C-alpha cells in the first residue's frame, strides 16, 4: 500500500520488524498503526547517515523479532548545516551543528505532511484534513574518548479530520450492477 510507511518482509508481518536509531530501539516506529492514510515514519531521512537492513541471520543483540532488523544511524555533524524541502504533500527542515571543540553535536529535524490531495479521490466525498507533524532532536556530548552521552527526543502530533458529504458504492455482478448513494 503506497499510503503507508509500514513494510512487510517475506515470512513475517509488519510488526515483526525491529527498528533501531543510533542503538535506541524504537518500539512503535510508525506514528499511526492502522496502516492506512498513515503519517510519518519515526525515521527522519534528513538526519540519516547510515542504514543497515537484515532480513535474517542478524546478531543476537537485536533481540527476538522474527522478520528483519532496520538499524539506522543518524549523522554526527562536524559543522553547521541545514536543509529545507517542500512538496505538494508536505515540508521538512533540518539543522545540524557542532561546538568549536567538537564535544557537543546536535541534529534537529521537523516535518509536516498532509495527504489531503490524495484522499480527495476516495469514494466517500467530503472534507479531508489529515495533518501529521513531528520534530526530532539528537544531542551528543563527548566527555572523553571513553565517555559520551547521547539523547534523542521526538514530538509528534497526528490529526485526521474528516467531514463526510456523500458516498457512492457500487456492488453486484457485471450484468446487474447496483449503486447506493448516501448523502
Protein language model regions, located:
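Membrane-spanning beta-strands of outer-membrane beta-barrel proteins
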Residues: 2, 88-90, 132, 180-182
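Extracytoplasmic
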Residues: 4, 14-16, 46-48, 65-69, ...
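Extracytoplasmic loops and strand-loop junctions of Gram-negative outer membrane beta-barrel proteins
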Residues: 32-37, 53-54, 75-78, 118-123, ...
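Structural signature of outer-membrane beta-barrel domains
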Residues: 14, 26, 89, 113-115, ...
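Predominantly transmembrane beta-strands of Gram-negative outer membrane beta-barrel pores used
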Residues: 50-61, 67-75, 81-126, 134-142, ...
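Extracytoplasmic beta-strand/coil segments of soluble accessory domains associated
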Residues: 1-28
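Flexible loop and strand-edge segments within Gram-negative outer membrane beta-barrel domains
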Residues: 115, 126, 148-183
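Short acidic/polar hinge/loop motifs at secondary-structure boundaries
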Residues: 25-53
